[in-house]
Amino acid sequence: MLFDTPVRLGVQIQPQHVQYSDIRDAVLRLEEMGVDVLFNWDHFFPLYGDPDGEHFESWTMLAAWAEQTERVEFGALVNCNSYRGADLQADMARTIDHISKKGGDTGRFIFGTGSGWFQRDYDEYGYDFGTAGSRLNALATDLDRVVERWGKLNPAPTRGIPVMIGGKGEQKTLRIVARHADIWHSFVTPDELPHKFGVIEKWAETEGRDLSGLIVSNELKDRDETVADALFDAGTRLFTLGFSGPDWDYSLIERWLTWRDSKNA
C-alpha cells in the first residue's frame, strides 16, 4: 500500500436535481478551490429525492469535464460495468484520457468501475440484473478485457490509466482489487482496514501482483476530522466527499481542504 503519498481530496458531484449549467459551474469552482479529484456517478435516475427528478448520464459528462478542466483528475465513482461492453469502456476511457491531456504530459482520467447495484437502471434500460455474484464475475472478466484492449488501441492511452475499484467483499471484490486496482475505495472503518489489507495482500500473492503502489480511498460522509485522522493513520490517502446541488455548500469543501492541507504540511 502506498502510504508515503500526499493526502488528496476528491469531490463527487451528484448529477441529480440540477441543470447541467449548475454542474459546469460547480466543476469550475471546485477546480479553482484546489480540489484534487472530481467524480460523478454512473446511474440513469436520481438515487434520492424525487426519483423522476433531473439527472444526467455519466460518461458524456466526463468527456465534457476532460475539455473543461485543466488540472484535476476525474472519473466516475463508479462506472457500472453492466451498461457498456468492456472493449467500448476501454476505448471511451482512452479517448477521454487523450481529451484531458491538453498539452500536459498525460491525461487525467481515472477509470473507477464496479459491478452495479441500482436495479431501476437495469430494468428501465433493458439490462439483465442477474445476481450480485454474477455481476462481480462479469466485472472480473471484463476488466481483463479492458486492460487487454488498452494494449491494442491506436493511439494507446497517454499513461497507465489508474483503475479504481470500490468494495470490501473478501471472496470476490478484494480479489478483483488485488488483480487490477491502483486505487481501492474501501468503505470500511479505520479498525477494519488492517484486516482488509491482509486479505488483499493474500489475493495479491495469488495473482502475482505487487501492491506497493495501491492507494487507499475512503469517504467522508457523516464523518468528522477525528474519524478522518484515524483513517489517515490507518493508511487512507484519498478522501471523497459527496456534493449535491442546487444549493452547493462550498464551506464544506473549504473545511476539508483545510484538513487536507494540514496533513500535507
Question: What is each stretch, according to the model?
Answer:
Residues 1-265:
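Active-site-adjacent structural elements that line small-molecule/cofactor binding pockets in enzymes
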